[in-house]
Amino acid sequence: MNIQLYKALWGMEGSYRDQLTRAAQAGYTGIEAPLPPRDLEREFKDLLAELQLYYIAQVVTSVPHQETFAEQVRRATDFDPKLIVSHSARDGMKIEDQLFFFEAALKIEQEVGITIGHETHRSRAMFTPWTTRRLLEEFPELSITADFSHWCCVTETMLEDYAEDMEVAIRRAVHIHARVGYAQGPQVPHPGAPEYSRELAAFETWWKRIIQYRSEQGFSYTSMTPEFGPANSGYMHTLPFTGAPVTDLWEVNEWMSKRISERMTP
């Protein structure tokens, strides 16, 4: 089982050339990012080819959700992504509207021929373990991008009481967002800090189970994106009064990448 590490552009600074060059020099398989602005599409494509980076496209739905999903996914195909990660629908939608959305989403996925992992994200349809399980059982072909940090935050637990839901999610994950959360938030200040060793161990256990299951199913690789976020997003902890981030964003994601490379091979 090969682990493919992707660099999230979230929080990076500089031009696309600056960002993608840094990712390539750091040894990442590819990048994960939203679709580029239309006036930068050619530059973005050329840089991916020049630097030999794969691309995971991110799409974010808004009202009307079916239409915005379809438009973004079809546009994403122009960039030959290895995978599409979607922030899909909303948590407050009626269940019948969510079912209608995901039925349509599966048809679009089949049309474009690219795997789509619907992210387990706060404010979205898959914002809890139990709502996600319900959708996955309703649609056997539906896949997720596993970002369990959001579920820890929503449930205010380390998911001890949701073993059956977690088992379903683990078996349906096609991509991992490797960020460590805790019971009161989606991102610990630093995953290497000893005071968060319990949280790190829990997340590594979940990730290993995903990787092991994919290996048993005959997949040759699992893709993972270390995705600790910046201070201006509300994810990175900051010092009071100054607003200074408590750690360096590049360093914390590099720490996670190195840890994955050393520990995640089954």
List each model region and its residues.
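N-terminal pre-domain/capping segments
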Residues: 1-73, 77, 254, 258-266
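Alpha-helix-loop-beta-strand connector modules within alpha/beta enzyme cores
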Residues: 42-63, 104-112, 138-139, 204-209
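Short, hinge-like loop/turn segments at secondary-structure boundaries
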Residues: 48-52, 73-76, 102-103, 134-136, ...
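Active-site-proximal loop/turn and secondary-structure-junction residues that shape catalytic pockets
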Residues: 9-11, 35-37, 61-63, 88-92, ...
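Active-site acidic/histidine proton-transfer and metal-coordination neighborhood
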Residues: 61-143
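Histidine-acidic metal/acid-base catalytic patches
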Residues: 2, 13-22, 138-143, 152-266
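Hydrophobic faces of well-ordered beta-strands that scaffold small-molecule active sites
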Residues: 1-8, 31-33, 53-60, 84-86, ...
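Glycine-enriched alpha-helix->loop->beta-strand junction motifs that scaffold or abut catalytic
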Residues: 27-29, 50-53, 80-82, 138-144, ...
